Each structure stands twice: as structure tokens, then as C-alpha cells.
């Protein structure tokens, strides 16, 4: 192996070793299945202590790039184009460790529902139930921060308010919520880096978006919020929201009707719905850590060190070729416009389906965390087959091309073209497609459900490849 350790570098020797082996694996100079030199041999070749090499190998093993065979032997398991790349940035697409804890808690009245639903503790009505939900825009606010710092345009944060609200609203849609919703926003900022005008833009954006939702029939109202100055916790800004509502138990979409024999209708995440003000890239609010680092250039790491986790390996930080103002390939948008595109809500479409076609919807899945594999959490002994997906939108193609991320992993991190799935009888699929079309949102039958003898699993067709997820 061609490894050279610079003893005069400010980068620790173990990190230099990690970065160089990482590069050799990514460029396939070290191939999957190839046995690595022993720790002792690497230490001798690099002039390092054995414990320094061992520390580097543990880091590579954590990233999923190598696997220990014995006390000192390792085998290459693949490039970080798989799950290792996302995990190495401190992010989990499926939040396995979180779900392992939540599984032990009370699941509420309807254990298979998309959101936790409780008895009506607010009003005490036995025929009603409460739904409370919390979510946010994730690290998308950091991209807005970069854009603001580069341009001085504070209005970019208005879209961030929409992202945070939609991530709550569209989860609530999946349990059939169409009543009155109160939403509260939480802003955690580094006040030295994020002045008051950013907070003002976020609040204004929230109020404007809530007002626009009411104009299209969504009964959502502002419940105020909280702004905290927590510079020790964040170098930039974090935007989250919490929604609460009351609904009748008989109207809940419980998830129990997601069974074999259904059509899966995907609602496109791209284009421009007639209730949107601009073209949507489809990016949503998931996978933005990877999108930001894989697309944007080292320029942002050097100029804005407060915008990334210093614990992440240097070669995974802002390692892309683009600046925010650069054109996105195969798109009319710039890179900045594409990754800041506000998350689309499907509320007007779902509301109309619920009101005009009662019983048509058997289940709804918001393809947020876990993306196209989110469906695996719902139903029992189901084989989800997705063999007619939308072509990957330009923003996701660009991310894959610059990062060399495996397509199988892309479908676990990004929505890849549709962010809402409607599960319905096959002969009702055209109704869903027509209703979506009336809002200028593309829809298509992306797949179906069949019986499975081995628990829930997903077969996803990408070009000539078939990706398998689940047991």
C-alpha cells in the first residue's frame, strides 16, 4: 500500500492513516475482500506505534470499510459509498438505535399507526384521541446559513420554516389527520453567528407558510415558540417544530389495512405544484448532511468551520466540487437552489382524497427517515415491490455522481423522486393519480404489496438492478 505519514503535519498520524486507507478503498486500489497487512506490519512500514495503527483500524471498522478477522488481521468490506459514508458523518438513515429504545415504550392506541396516538387527555372525550408530533429541518438550516453568509439574503430562512413545519404536518397526514392543528417552533441558535434578523425571517416564514396552508384548506394555526441562545451546543442554528391535534378515533388511518394486494401510488417530490411558488428539486429535509458535504466544496469548510462537526474525518467534510451558485447538472436550478428547495407538503392532495373518497386510502407512508425503505416499518409479512419508480431527480443524480454512493444506499437516504406513498386498491390508483394531477403534482403506480413468508421485505428496481432490503 502507498501510505505516507507526514510527521510534521497538524493532522494526527492515526487520522492520516485513516484518510489514506479510506482513499485507497474508495478508488478501489484496495478491493472488497482483500486482506489488509497486519497491524504490526503496517506499523513497521509507516513508522508508527502499533496502538496508533490499531486506533486507525477501529475507525475504519466503525465506518464499515474493514472487518476484523482476528487480533491483527482485517479484510476490506467495501468503499464508503455504502452505509459507512453516512454513518461516518454521525448520521443514521434508519435510526436503528433510537427505534430499539422506542420499541420498549407504549406504542399508544394504534400500535401500527404512522404516529403515536394517545387517548384524548386534552379534552377527555372517549371518542377522540390526541396526536402530538415533533420534527425539524435537520441540517438543512446549515445550508441556509452558508447561503446567508455568502449573499446576505436572510429571506432564505423562510424556506427553512416551511421545511420544519412540513416534516410534522406530512407525518400527521399519514394517520388521517385533517382537523385543526396547532404548531409551535423551536429555534436553537448561536447568537454570535446568527443575528436577530435570522430569527425574524424564520418567524415571518412560519407565519406566512401557515397562512398559505389555510388558504388551501389546511386547518393549521401558530402556537408560538421558543428561541434559545445555545452557542455551546451549535455553531449555527437548529430549527424544529412540534404539532398537536385532536381527532376522532374512527377517522384514524391505523396502518392495519396495509396488506397484500394493494397498489402503491407515489406522489412526486419534484416540479411545481399549483400551491407552490417555485420549482421544487425534490430534496425534502432528509439526507441533507450527505447532500451538503458531498456536493459543496472545501471552500465552505475553510471559511465556515462552525458549520461542521470537527470529529468527522476531513476527507468527508465539504468534499464536493460545487459552490452554491454553480448550476446543477441537468437542471434549471443552481446547486444552492436545489438543496435549499423547500420541502413540499402533500396536505392539499391528501385532504381531498380523505374528504371526497372516504375509504380509498388504506395506508399512507411519508418517505422521510429511511426514504424508500420506510415502508418496511408498516404491515406484517409484506413483500413491498417497487418496480416503476420515478427517474431519479437531478439533485440526487448529482449527489450520487460526485460521491460514488451506491444506488442501493441512495434509496435508503433520499426520497429519490417521491416522498409520499398512497396504498390503495389497484382499481382506485387512477383516482389518486387524477387528484394529484389536479394540483399539478405527478403521481404513478410505483409498485405493489404481496405476501411474504419471511417478514417485511422490499424489492426495489433501479434500471437493470434489483435491490433487496429487509430480512
Residue ranges and their predicted role:
Residues 35-67:
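N-terminal helix-turn-helix
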Residues 84-471:
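Helix-biased detector of long, well-ordered alpha-helical tracts
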Residues 36, 68-80:
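Short, Lys/Arg-rich nucleic-acid/phosphate-binding segment
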Residues 29, 64, 176:
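Conserved functional loop/turn residues at catalytic and ligand-binding sites
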Residues 18, 54, 166:
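Conserved catalytic core of two-component sensor histidine kinases
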Residues 1-36, 41, 83, 93:
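Extreme N-terminal segment that seeds HTH/winged-HTH DNA-binding domains in transcriptional regulators
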Residues 22-23, 58, 170:
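Core alpha-helical elements of the protein kinase catalytic domain
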Amino acid at each position: 500500500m502507498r501510505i505516507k505519514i507526514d510527521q510534521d503535519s497538524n493532522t494526527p498520524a492515526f487520522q492520516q492513516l485513516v484518510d489514506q486507507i479510506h482513499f485507497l478503498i474508495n478508488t478501489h486500489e484496495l478491493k472488497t475482500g482483500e486482506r489488509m497487512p497486519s497491524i504490526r506490519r503496517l506499523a513497521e512500514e509507516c513508522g508508527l506505534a502499533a496502538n496508533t495503527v490499531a486506533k486507525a483500524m477501529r475507525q475504519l471498522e466503525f465506518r464499515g470499510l474493514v472487518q476484523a478477522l482476528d487480533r491483527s488481521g482485517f479484510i476490506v468490506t467495501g468503499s464508503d459509498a455504502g452505509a459507512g459514508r453516512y454513518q461516518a458523518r454521525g448520521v443514521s438513515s434508519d435510526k436503528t438505535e433510537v427505534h430499539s429504545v422506542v420499541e420498549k415504550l407504549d406504542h399508544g392506541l394504534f400500535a401500527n399507526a404512522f404516529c403515536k396516538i394517545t387517548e384524548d387527555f386534552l379534552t377527555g372525550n372517549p371518542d377522540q384521541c390526541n396526536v402530538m408530533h415533533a420534527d425539524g429541518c435537520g441540517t438543512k438550516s446549515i445550508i441556509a446559513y452558508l447561503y446567508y453568509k455568502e449573499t446576505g439574503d436572510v429571506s432564505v430562512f423562510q424556506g427553512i420554516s416551511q421545511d420544519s413545519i412540513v416534516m410534522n404536518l406530512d407525518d400527521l397526514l399519514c394517520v388521517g389527520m385533517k382537523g385543526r392543528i396547532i404548531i409551535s417552533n423551536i429555534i436553537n441558535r448561536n447568537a454570535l453567528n446568527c443575528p436577530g434578523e435570522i430569527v425574524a425571517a424564520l418567524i415571518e416564514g412560519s407565519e406566512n407558510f401557515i397562512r398559505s396552508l389555510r388558504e388551501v384548506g389546511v386547518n393549521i394555526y401558530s402556537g408560538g415558540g421558543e428561541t434559545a441562545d445555545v452557542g455551546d451546543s451549535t455553531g449555527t442554528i437548529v430549527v424544529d417544530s412540534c404539532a398537536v391535534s385532536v381527532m376522532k378515533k374512527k377517522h384514524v388511518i391505523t396502518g392495519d389495512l396495509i396488506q397484500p394486494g394493494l397498489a402503491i401510488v407515489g406522489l412526486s417530490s419534484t416540479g411545481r405544484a399549483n400551491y407552490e411558488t417555485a420549482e421544487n428539486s425534490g430534496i425534502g429535509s432528509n439526507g441533507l448532511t450527505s447532500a451538503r458535504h458531498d456536493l459543496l466544496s472545501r471552500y465552505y469548510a475553510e471559511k465556515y468551520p462552525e458549520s461542521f462537526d470537527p470529529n468527522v474525518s476531513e476527507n468527508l467534510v465539504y468534499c464536493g466540487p460545487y459552490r452554491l451558485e454553480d448550476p446543477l447538472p441537468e437542471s434549471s436550478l443552481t446547486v444552492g437552489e436545489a438543496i435549499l428547495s423547500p420541502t413540499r407538503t402533500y396536505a392539499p392532495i391528501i385532504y381531498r382524497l380523505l374528504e371526497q373518497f372516504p375509504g380509498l386510502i388504506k395506508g399512507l407512508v411519508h418517505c422521510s427517515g429511511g426514504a424508500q425503505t420506510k415502508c418496511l416499518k408498516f404491515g406484517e409479512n409484506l413483500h413491498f415491490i417497487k418496480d416503476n419508480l420515478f427517474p431519479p431527480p437531478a439533485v440526487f443524480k448529482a449527489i450520487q455522481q460526485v460521491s460514488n454512493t451506491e444506488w442501493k444506499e441512495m434509496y435508503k437516504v433520499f426520497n429519490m423522486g417521491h416522498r409520499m406513498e398512497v396504498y390503495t386498491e389497484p382499481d382506485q390508483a387512477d383516482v389518486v393519480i387524477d387528484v394529484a394531477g389536479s394540483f399539478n403534482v405527478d403521481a404513478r403506480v410505483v409498485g405493489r404489496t404481496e405476501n411474504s413468508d419471511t417478514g417485511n421485505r422490499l424489492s426495489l428496481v433501479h434500471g437493470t438492478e434489483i435491490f433487496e432490503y429487509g430480512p
